[in-house]
């Protein structure tokens, strides 16, 4: 189903908005189609501050109302236990919160930015969306990640080349308890490295050691700033390792 047709059939909808490339294009397409939409951003300890700032910036540029819903995800012991299906339990909490808020605002249709490149078999979170009857117009329209980036660039969206970003909880090994301190440490380290010019990277925890995963094109940058990175991250970690299995 083409997006124009989708919004013609669903002219009023709530959009689960993360500030990433996919949900950003979905929100743009809804506005372009003249739909009555509202964006909902759920703020938990799993999202870094820059994601909220990007979401607010784009919603402002599109002139779309956006509501921030605070959610204490760390009070859910099923989530913080960090089981293999943590994403399912987390998404269930997040989208349940959005659906409740959207219902109060009179929206019965809830949308998210899952695209045709996302494999439902590899993403437990998609099961939560199905259980809560969340629609994914980009996926239904057959739009892949590459196509969404191209269309976003044509539309002038600053998110067109924004790297895919998995939540901070993914930096902690499965089965290891997730705590606020571990999340804060990860966000602090990644914010510092982003300031050096790194893009599309991860700081993964290996006990008290930080393992840096970067793109091949950023290896020289890391080596150039090796001593500086080691000294700065050494304030919070006992050691810093560079993963030679590069991203992308």
Label each PLM-derived region with a short phrase.
Residues 1-128, 133-154, 195, 210, ...:
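ATP-dependent adenylation/nucleotidyltransferase module used to activate substrates
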Residues 38, 205-216:
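Short, aliphatic-rich beta-strand segments
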Residues 74, 173-174, 217-218:
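A short, flexible beta-alpha/helix-coil linker loop
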Residues 139-145, 149-193, 197-203:
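Mid-to-C-terminal catalytic subdomains of enzymes
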Residues 184, 226-227:
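Charged helix-capping and loop-helix junction motifs
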Residues 199-206, 243-247:
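C-terminal boundary motif of the adenylate-forming
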Residues 218-225:
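Short, conserved charged micro-motifs
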């Amino acid at each position: 189903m083409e997006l124009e047709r989708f919004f013609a059939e669903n002219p009023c909808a709530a959009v689960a908005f993360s500030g990433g490339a996919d949900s950003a294009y979905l929100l743009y397409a809804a506005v372009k189609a003249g739909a009555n939409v509202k964006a909902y951003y759920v703020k938990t300890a799993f999202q870094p501050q820059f994601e909220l700032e990007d979401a607010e910036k784009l919603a402002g540029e599109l002139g779309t109302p956006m509501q921030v819903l605070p959610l204490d995800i760390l009070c859910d012991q099923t989530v913080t236990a960090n089981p293999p299906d943590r994403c399912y339990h987390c998404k269930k909490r997040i989208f349940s919160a959005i659906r409740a808020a959207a219902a109060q605002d009179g929206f019965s249709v809830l949308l998210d930015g899952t695209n045709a490149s996302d494999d439902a078999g590899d993403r437990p979170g998609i099961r939560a969306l199905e259980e809560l009857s969340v629609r994914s117009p980009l996926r239904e329209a057959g739009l892949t990640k590459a196509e969404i980036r191209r269309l976003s660039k044509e539309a002038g969206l600053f998110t067109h080349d924004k790297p895919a970003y998995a939540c901070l909880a993914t930096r902690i090994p499965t089965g290891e308890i997730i705590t606020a301190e571990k999340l804060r440490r990860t966000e602090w380290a990644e914010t510092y490295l982003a300031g050096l010019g790194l893009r599309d990277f991860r700081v993964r925890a290996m006990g008290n050691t930080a393992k840096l995963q970067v793109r091949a094109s950023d290896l020289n940058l890391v080596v150039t700033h090796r001593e500086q990175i080691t000294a700065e991250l050494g304030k919070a970690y006992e050691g810093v390792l560079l993963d030679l299995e590069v991203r992308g």
